[in-house]
Amino acid sequence: MTQPVMKQAGQFTIAGISGDGGQTAKVWARFEEMYGAKPFAKAYADACEVRFYSNEEQGKDIFVGYALAEGADVGGFETLVLPAVPYAVFDVLVTQGYDSGNATMDKWLDDNAHIYGALEMDGKGFIVECYTERFKDGDKPDSVVEMWVPLYRVCQSCSMPMTKAADFGKNADGTPSADYCCYCHSNGAFGNPDETLEEMIESCIPFCWEQYVDDDAARADMRARFPKLKRWAK
């Protein structure tokens, strides 16, 4: 598996059905039967499978279907809205197994944790499997499935997760900052331009007490992570 391709996707809706991830083939067969009987307009031809993790709803840890065309009648299908966020897209050779890329994806997320985090939906981790024209029924040596890992950006000043549009700061021209949160950056400038790294760490500690056993643990972790952030990188 190579390094991922970064893609920024707009919000889109998948129409389909949910089911048991342990019975994937049966879920797909049921969806295809339903779609054959009552098709809906697709936004594009690729099929999608969304897998959820840490899911307490038994039997509803996958969602399969197609992207719904804008304004199309969904009929009797369920819908799942995927957010407009960046995705890290990994290619996985089907013959090596769908889980064969997990270690590479985990390592990439760990190596880039100062820039990105894995986005959750309603408290659950998820990944989108896309079946494009490169997926050749899974029985060819070069058959590929794309694994789309949804991401949020990390503020490059205070490391706050920026998971929604309101979290981002503003550039001087009013456009959203790609790097800094609304608390650190406004109108193209830092709110406290003379702030030191240590001062930033101390100001962040009261907001993350749930993540650490005590202030010293928080301080030690931030001292290890913050120098990698864009504002503080040497």
Name each region found by the language model:
Residues 197-234:
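Short, intrinsically disordered terminal segments enriched in charged and Pro/Gly residues
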